[in-house]
Amino acid sequence: MRLVESVPNFSEGRRLDVVERLANAVESVRGAFLLDRTMDASHNRSVLTIAGQAEPVTEALERAVAVAVHEIDMEVHWGEHPRIGSVDVIPFVPLGETTIDDCVEMARAFGRRIADRFEMPVYLYAAAATRPDRIKLSDVRRGQYEGLKAEIGSRGREPDFGPSRMHPSAGAVAVGARPFLIAYNINLASEDLELAKRIARRVRESGGGLPKVQANGFWIEELRRAQVSMNLLDYTVTPLWQVWETVQAEAAADGVELAESELIGLAPLASFLDVADHAGAPVDDPAESRLAAAAEFLKLRDFSPQQALELRLAAARRA
């Protein structure tokens, strides 16, 4: 049995009815469990977390792609988050005894499948990449939708599958295989966007900061706050508590406090327990108490214990 997680990102965060249709498409497949969904108006982006055996998960993904291709028009899309298509990115993540090589195989097969069905260009990234300059998602998304639309026919920008032209409304999609990624945002108690961008440059690995951390600064209109938005590519290398404390120190140097933080999607239970250990929570406390201690330390907004992947999947299987 090959268990897999996928976390497709869709370029729609303002129309609830469209996000509902995306979620319904996933839930229509027996054996595919929709564990989480988030919707962000400023980023104009929604994220679904799907887990289960490989076959139902890939079927659920294909049904969701069909909805996105029909409902989301990239010609009129705008938002804070970088993107290249209505379905911007589809990662396959190994769970249980599934290996990253298994996920590479799934990603490549699925990429070809949706390229053929929807006549949409597909770029393989991360462990599924077929060339070194496409390992990083940021390299695949260089120039975003508008830039790729202008360059897709040029040498070096041709897709792995599908036509060397953008789908007229859905754009392109990146499909890959990667280890578990934690999407983690910290909101500053400040409206200073430039400060958020400076902090992001200092904490991300490419700027000499924290290993396995990507970061950008954004303005979040509905909160009226500046945000440091991050991807933790390996929480065992740079844990959540270290990210929080590093951003806290950088902000404090400018006299700014941290308002709160948030997870986009789910995170492994071990990543929360690591924070609880750092916060001094007794190791023999119940898991729920240790999760609460971790959430308090990180000032996690709207936290639920069900944001721990293992707890959410167990609950979904019991339902």
Which ranges hold each PLM region?
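Long, contiguous binding/interaction regions
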Residues: M1-A319
